[in-house]
């Protein structure tokens, strides 16, 4: 199985424009994410996917592989889907471009799902939240899964309700690493956006 790591990076973020190029110890943030991704031995290639000339220039200056993509994409997953039309691969892993200290083992954990069960077409991660402040934080995306571990709902609000039978329910945060088999990614990219 050929596995491709993709780091979507856009300059025009509404909350923090230029975030991928913010300087961290003399290097742009995107460089640190790329270095962490390169530590994943399962990756055959790692690319930054961007629509911005400044990010492309920074990638080239720091010897990172970069692919220019459309500026019409609504999500990082759409950007990864475009990369899948330009690069041969069986599995594409979307790594958030604003996580300079992402643990490579977490990326490997997502990839391992596809080796354990060949019927899996899409995967992501969840981690239990134990800090009450993080449970309440709207900056943390929470996820509810079914008994098999399949995601049912994502929210920045507290889900599930934080009290169940008089005791606190377990709450999980979504870890923003997504992996897609090529066929699933092609179908996913054709789906229209919804309000949720």
Name each model-derived stretch:
Residues 43, 89, 117-120:
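Short, high-confidence coil segments that cap the C-terminus of an alpha-helix
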Residues 104-194:
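Conserved core of the sugar-phosphate nucleotidyltransferase
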Residues 15, 101, 179:
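Short aromatic/basic micro-patch
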Residues 5, 46-48, 92, 123, ...:
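Hydrophobic/aromatic residues located in beta-strands of well-ordered beta-sheets
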Residues 30, 98, 181:
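Residue-level signal for inorganic ion chemistry
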């Amino acid at each position: 199985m050929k596995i491709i790591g993709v780091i979507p990076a856009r300059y025009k973020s509404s909350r923090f424009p230029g975030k991928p190029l913010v300087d961290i110890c003399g290097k742009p943030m995107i460089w640190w994410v790329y270095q962490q991704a390169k530590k994943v031995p399962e990756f055959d290639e790692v690319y930054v996917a961007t629509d911005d000339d400044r990010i492309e220039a920074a990638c080239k200056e720091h010897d990172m592989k970069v692919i220019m993509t459309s500026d019409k994409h609504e999500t990082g997953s759409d950007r990864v889907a475009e990369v899948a039309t330009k690069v041969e691969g069986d599995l594409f892993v979307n790594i958030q471009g604003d996580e300079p200290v992402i643990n490579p083992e977490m990326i490997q954990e997502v990839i391992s799902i596809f080796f354990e069960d060949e019927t899996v077409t899409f995967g992501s991660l969840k981690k239990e939240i134990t800090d009450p402040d993080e449970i309440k934080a709207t900056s943390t995306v929470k996820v509810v899964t079914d008994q098999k571990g399949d995601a049912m709902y994502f929210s920045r609000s507290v889900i599930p309700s934080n009290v169940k039978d008089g005791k606190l329910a377990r709450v999980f945060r979504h870890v923003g690493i997504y992996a897609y088999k090529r066929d699933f990614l092609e179908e996913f990219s054709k789906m229209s956006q919804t309000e949720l």
